[in-house]
């Protein structure tokens, strides 16, 4: 099981305010075929102990295409809602990504294309995201220290973002003032 501590801040919308603070996130990947897995993950708010998110996602990988596709469902808990009300925030998830290696001589520099669609329990689309990222991985920057830099642009929101990952630490920053830090345990 993969476990991480996640801290988010900087949001100005009420929805993002409910997601701020320290959360404990757990993820388990269960292989079901050579190129497919079932991914279950959830998180709890560290201060209240209340669940904030639960999800189950079927993911299929296409190695020859450097692509993957995911389909699943999720529940977002908002402001310590009791369990029956939390089911009102049930959603379906469809996500896809494709990696492009523009320089075959340097496989550590690449372009990622990502898309995600969330739909409510009646299959009405609620959230769409699409992004393009330039990703650069630097192995052994210092002994035992791998670094990954990502510069991305959210196409639908017209907003750039940045990610810096160093071994177990990840820092994300967005131009609208949001940010998050993750530490993989």
From Swiss-Prot:
Record carries keyword Zinc: no
Chief location bin: plastid
InterPro entries for the chain: OEP21
Membrane topology (Cytoplasmic): 1-29, 74-88, 116-128, 156-160
Record bears the keyword Methyltransferase: no
Location of the region described as Disordered in the Swiss-Prot/TrEMBL record: 1-22
Keywords on record: Chloroplast, Ion transport, Membrane, Plastid, Plastid outer membrane, Porin, Transmembrane, Transmembrane beta strand, Transport
Gene Ontology molecular function terms on file: porin activity; voltage-gated monoatomic anion channel activity
GO biological-process terms attached to the record: regulation of monoatomic anion transport
Topology within the bilayer: Multi-pass membrane protein
Chloroplast intermembrane side: 40-63, 99-105, 139-145, 171-176
Transmembrane segments: 30-39, 64-73, 89-98, 106-115, 129-138, 146-155, 161-170, 177-185
Gene Ontology annotations for the cellular component aspect, listed alphabetically: chloroplast outer membrane; etioplast membrane; pore complex
Similarity remark: Belongs to the plastid outer envelope porin OEP21 (TC 1.B.29) family.
Task of the protein: Voltage-dependent rectifying anion channel that facilitates the translocation between chloroplast and cytoplasm of phosphorylated carbohydrates such as triosephosphate, 3-phosphoglycerate and inorganic phosphate (Pi) depending of ATP to triosephosphate ratio in the plastidial intermembrane space; in high triosephosphate/ATP conditions (e.g. photosynthesis), export of triosphosphate from chloroplast (outward rectifying channels), but in high ATP/triosephosphate conditions (e.g. dark phase), import of phosphosolutes (inward rectifying channels).
Protein name stated in the entry: Outer envelope pore protein 21, chloroplastic
Protein's organism: Oryza sativa subsp. indica
């Amino acid at each position: 099981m993969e476990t991480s501590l996640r801290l988010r801040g900087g949001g100005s919308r009420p929805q993002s305010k409910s997601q701020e603070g320290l959360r404990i996130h757990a993820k388990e990947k269960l292989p079901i075929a050579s190129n497919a897995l079932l991914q279950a993950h959830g998180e709890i708010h560290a201060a209240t102990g209340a669940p904030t998110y639960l999800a189950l996602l079927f993911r299929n990988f296409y190695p020859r295409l450097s692509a993957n596709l995911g389909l699943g469902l999720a529940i977002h808990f908002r402001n310590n809602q009791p369990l029956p009300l939390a089911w009102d925030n049930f959603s379906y998830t469809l996500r896809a990504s494709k990696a492009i290696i523009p320089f075959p001589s340097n496989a550590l520099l690449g372009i990622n294309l990502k898309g995600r669609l969330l739909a409510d329990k009646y299959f009405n689309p609620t959230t769409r995201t699409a992004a393009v990222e330039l990703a650069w991985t630097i192995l052994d920057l210092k002994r035992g220290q791998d670094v990954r830099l990502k510069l991305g642009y959210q196409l639908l929101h017209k907003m750039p973002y940045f990610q810096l990952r160093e071994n177990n630490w990840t820092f994300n920053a967005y131009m609208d003032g949001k940010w998050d830090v993750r530490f993989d345990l």
